[in-house]
Regions:
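Long, low-complexity intrinsically disordered regions
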Residues: 1-218
Length: 218
């Protein structure tokens, strides 16, 4: 996993599905990131690279994308996503979490806008909720798996060319992948889902200390 094996959106998608999880940036597990698996020559060029591949990979529909590990971006295969949701949600759909008083009110405001829209760019949410801490709410909802990044939207010039950094578009995982899939592991104990995720990563990075994996995904 330490070779420069990711050279396109297709190979990125393939590795994310194979491993089950693929962080975008370097982390505590050596070699376990797009940053390390993609040649330096493909970053920040005039041609599409890892930054620009995010949208196409998400749109393929094989992987979810969001800030899932330590508030950092990760691709998660649809095979592993139900286990991540089961573990992070700990038996709570969002409404149930609200009923038990476990949700910050601003998180609920953000979630409701995203859920009701079916998919909305972050800039539009910012306009509806004027709060300097809104990025914190986006991140917390992603870490809890109640929202995911559904695409990246780019500005276009008069001649139709895209430019600048892509703006994240958010949706609920249920609206993107279906509630049946997302909740398919709800009968599994969250601790069992966690163990399945740990073992999956160790399968591909066996030299990694188990505790390191636990700390990364906990």
């Amino acid at each position: 996993m330490r070779n420069f094996d990711i050279t396109s959106a297709e190979t990125l998608d393939g590795y994310a599905r194979k491993i089950g999880f693929l962080p975008f940036f370097k982390n505590s597990i050596r070699g376990f990131s797009v940053e390390e698996m993609c040649p330096p020559s493909l970053w920040f060029t005039d041609r599409p690279g890892p930054w620009e591949w995010k949208g196409p990979v998400i749109r393929k529909g094989n992987c979810a994308y969001g800030k899932f590990f330590k508030n950092k971006a990760v691709y998660v295969s649809l095979e592993m996503l139900p286990h991540l949701c089961n573990y992070r949600r700990d038996g709570y759909d969002f409404d149930a979490r609200c009923d038990d008083g476990l949700v910050f009110y601003r998180d609920k405001d953000v979630y409701d806008i995203i859920a009701q829209s079916g998919g909305i760019i972050s800039k539009d949410v910012r306009q509806k909720i004027n709060d300097k801490d809104i990025d914190k709410y986006f991140t917390r909802l992603q870490m809890q798996t109640y929202i995911v990044t559904s695409d990246f939207v780019y500005e276009k010039s008069k001649d139709g060319r895209t430019y600048g950094w892509g703006v994240a578009k958010y949706a609920t995982p249920e609206s993107l992948y279906g509630a049946e899939l997302i909740r398919s592991q709800y009968k599994t104990k969250p601790s069992e889902s966690f163990e399945i995720m740990v073992e999956r990563i160790l399968k591909y990075f066996p030299e990694t200390d188990r505790q390191t994996v636990i700390k990364l995904i906990k």
